[in-house]
């Protein structure tokens, strides 16, 4: 049957099982929005800004594992998606961004709102398409979804000229193609070599990243950990891949990782890296990282092998499949003495919570106590690290955070996406006051959609993480980090249709958070904390991770 390009776009979205689109209309994409109006089976969430739409699509994808979809018009509409696309790219999140451009006859003529968005996004997508021929439209959209899902996931952009959305073409419905993970990159010899390394190790440590979540490998990973009988640490992106309440779990590795994980990895004789990219935030000084260990790396992307850290052996493949193969062959290991040594570290270096005063660690721990099944979302900064340190993530896809790009302003849009996709779950966004300012306009979106998400602002009136570095490494030169300008976040929240409370004590926070849990609309808690609160432990930039220090260490050193 013959359909217009706009109709083809909607039919292709339906083919792919898309039930929600986040976006903002405009002239070039108006034909598509007119067609979308006729299809209530696809929910459209109108955000307050296109960046919010891209973050919402990201949050939808992270919390479900499905492809998130966002749309924007030409020119500034398209460029406003860029930060969200880059955020998804850095964290390997499947997303399809659909933009519309000026007509073919107007391309290259500096036309109104013309922009080469495909060119702009080429470095931050798995692929960027521009469609100038309606006969190629359907297959391009199908390819976009396939590319976004296949192998290491990521965002794909499809830019469509306006005339293509109006032209007619024959359309034949197709079922979506879901390709199975490719196992051809590794051999039995690869598995056998890995098994030999594991069986020979006396002090193995398992290091888990976001790739384990993207692969859906949590159950296979659990069985692998039990067979290897080893302690487990993770990255920020790997939170929830392995049960954070397990006795084997020692917390995050790296700059703000636990002392146990940092010291343990520095002492281990085998580091099994699963779905990690060895970020600079993890290894500290690469020349001194895990120097006593042989390293076995398992990852679906060959580009990650030996990119930042040289490894002794690698297996390239889907994490769940590789671990499953290893589990079939691996005999039960026993490392009682090693695990006891690591347990001693955990007793020596616990993650402590200030007993008095309102603080980030206290609030995160209380949130865990009152809402341990929530989907946690964060912005970027000190509060992000506290959310990683003090909430025990027992399931995958329950911490949504910008790890690679470190995008301030990510959280509220992502929370909207997650809450839209998971209406029966509690979604909580942890923000700093600096981050909240970035995209607080999306609170109006949450109110309009009647989303019962909770926004906790850890309000220290400064850019906390930057101030921490200025305190520790820049002689307390607080350049451009003070935000004490009287902005009333409670009034802003109420003006946007949300309930809001300001709290200054532990008791006030407990009461406000209970009220927030019972709310049917967005609820903002403006929590006032000390400007000089710091994230501990910490590894200084460029230092080896075994030189991690906490507040007491820092005070002793600088007496």
Description of each model-found segment:
Residues 24-26, 45-55, 70-77, 132-133, ...:
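Active-site nucleophile and cofactor-binding loops and adjacent substrate-binding regions
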Residues 6-10, 14, 18-19, 32-36, ...:
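Active-site diphosphate/adenylate-binding microenvironment
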Residues 107, 112-113, 305-308, 314-316, ...:
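Thiamine diphosphate
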Residues 135, 173, 196, 292-380, ...:
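Phosphate/pyrophosphate-binding active-site segments
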Residues 1-330, 366, 452-457, 473-475, ...:
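N-terminal alpha/beta PP-like core and its mobile active-site loop of ThDP/TPP-dependent enzymes
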Residues 150, 371-372, 447-452:
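Basic phosphate/pyrophosphate-binding loop/patch that engages nucleotide-derived ligands
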Residues 26-29, 75, 92, 155, ...:
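Glycine-rich phosphate/pyrophosphate-binding beta-alpha loops
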Residues 157, 297, 377, 430-431:
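Generic enzyme active-site microenvironment
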């Amino acid at each position: 049957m013959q359909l217009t390009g706009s109709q083809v776009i909607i039919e292709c979205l339906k083919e792919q099982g898309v039930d929600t689109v986040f976006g903002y209309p405009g002239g070039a994409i108006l034909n598509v929005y007119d067609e979308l109006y006729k299809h209530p089976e696809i929910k459209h969430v109108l955000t307050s800004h296109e960046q919010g739409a891209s973050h919402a699509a990201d949050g939808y994808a992270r919390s479900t594992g499905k492809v998130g979809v966002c749309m924007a018009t030409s020119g500034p509409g398209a460029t406003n998606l860029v930060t969200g696309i880059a955020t998804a790219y850095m964290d390997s999140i499947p997303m399809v961004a659909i933009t519309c451009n000026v007509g073919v006859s107007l391309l290259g003529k500096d036309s109104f709102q013309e922009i080469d968005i495909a060119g702009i996004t080429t470095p931050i997508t798995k692929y960027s398409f521009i469609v100038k021929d309606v006969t190629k439209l359907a297959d391009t959209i199908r390819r976009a979804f396939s590319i976004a899902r296949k192998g290491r996931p990521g965002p794909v952009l499809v830019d469509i000229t306006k005339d293509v959305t109006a032209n007619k073409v024959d359309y034949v419905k197709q079922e979506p193609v879901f390709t199975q993970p490719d196992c051809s990159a590794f051999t039995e010899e690869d598995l056998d070599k890995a098994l030999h390394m594991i069986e020979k190790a006396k002090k193995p440590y398992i290091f888990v990243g976001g790739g384990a979540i993207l692969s859906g490998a949590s159950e296979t990973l659990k069985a692998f950990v039990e067979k290897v009988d080893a302690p487990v640490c993770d990255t920020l992106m790997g939170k929830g891949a392995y049960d954070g309440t397990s006795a084997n779990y020692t917390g995050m590795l790296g700059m703000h990782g636990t002392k146990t994980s940092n010291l343990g990895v520095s002492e281990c004789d085998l580091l099994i890296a699963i779905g990690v990219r060895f970020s600079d935030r993890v290894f500290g000084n690469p020349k001194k990282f895990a120097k006593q260990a042989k390293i076995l790396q398992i990852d679906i992307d060959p580009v990650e092998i030996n990119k930042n850290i040289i490894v002794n052996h690698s297996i390239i493949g889907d994490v769940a499949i590789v671990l499953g193969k290893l589990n079939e062959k691996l005999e039960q290991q026993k490392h009682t003495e090693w695990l006891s040594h690591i347990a001693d570290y955990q007793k020596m270096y616990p993650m402590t919570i200030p007993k008095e005063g309102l603080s980030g660690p206290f609030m995160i721990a209380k949130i865990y106590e009152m809402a341990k099944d929530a989907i946690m979302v964060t912005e970027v900064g000190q509060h992000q690290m506290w959310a990683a340190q003090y909430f025990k993530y027992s399931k995958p896809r329950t911490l949504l955070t910008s790890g690679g790009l470190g995008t301030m302003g990510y959280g509220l849009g992502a929370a909207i996406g997650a809450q839209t996709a998971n209406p029966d779950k509690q979604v909580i966004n942890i923000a700093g006051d600096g981050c909240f300012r970035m995209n607080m306009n999306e609170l109006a979106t949450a109110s309009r959609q009647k989303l019962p998400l909770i926004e906790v602002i850890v309000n220290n009136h400064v850019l906390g993480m930057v101030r921490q570095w200025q305190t520790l490494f820049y002689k307390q030169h607080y350049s451009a980090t003070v935000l004490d300008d009287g902005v009333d976040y409670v009034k802003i929240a109420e003006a946007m249709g949300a309930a809001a409370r300001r709290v200054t004590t532990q008791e006030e926070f407990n009461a406000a958070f209970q009220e927030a849990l019972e709310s049917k609309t967005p609820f903002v808690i403006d929590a006032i904390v000390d400007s000089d609160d710091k994230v501990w432990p910490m590894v200084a930039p460029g230092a080896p991770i075994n030189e991690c220090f906490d507040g007491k260490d820092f005070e002793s050193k600088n007496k």
